[in-house]
Amino acid sequence: YKRVEPLDILLALSINNVRALLTLTLGLMALIWSLTWDFRMDSPGLALCVYLLTISMAVGFGICLVFLGKFNKFITRLIKRLINRILIFTSALFFATFELPAHTRPFVTWNPLLHAVELFRYSLNNEYPIPDISLSYLIWCSTVTLGFSLILYRTNEALLLESLDD
């Protein structure tokens, strides 16, 4: 048999997490439909595109964290405790971007997760206002994050293989 690569393990974990999140999302949509007998999705293609871009960005971010954790455990703890909270708080899960004053929006629109959440809301209802939100920014962030992580993996694969042999 072919030797299992570290990327195979990371991708298997990612696929399992995506499967779980997709099941929860579809279950929630089915629950909404069964309770209200009304469910509309104005742009299902946009919703699928945003969902896949968010997944690819998360996989890239996870691969980067694996390598950062190999170099310094403190960075991993810092990212898990502090940076994750900042990303979640500024990702528009608790507020809508159009409710913010225009002069405060630049402080949160740097977050690509905010763009993903707002674009997903827009795909459900095309009348939802999305000021300063861009699909191209989400595509750029996903591509750069995944590309950087794959380059990092390719150049430092031996480091992971050495640590697995211990």
Report each predicted region and the residues it spans.
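Transmembrane helix segments
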Residues: 69-110
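Alpha-helical transmembrane segments and their short interhelical loops
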Residues: 6, 11-78, 133-140, 146-150
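Hydrophobic alpha-helical elements at and bordering transmembrane segments
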Residues: 9-10, 120, 156
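Juxtamembrane membrane-interface segments at transmembrane alpha-helix termini
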Residues: 56-65, 93-94, 118-122
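Junction motif at the cytosolic side of a transmembrane helix
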Residues: 140-166
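Short helix-to-coil transition segments within interhelical loops
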Residues: 1-5
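Short hydrophobic, aromatic-rich alpha-helical segments embedded in or entering the lipid bilayer
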Residues: 95-130, 134
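Membrane-interfacial segments
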Residues: 35-39, 69-73, 99, 124, ...
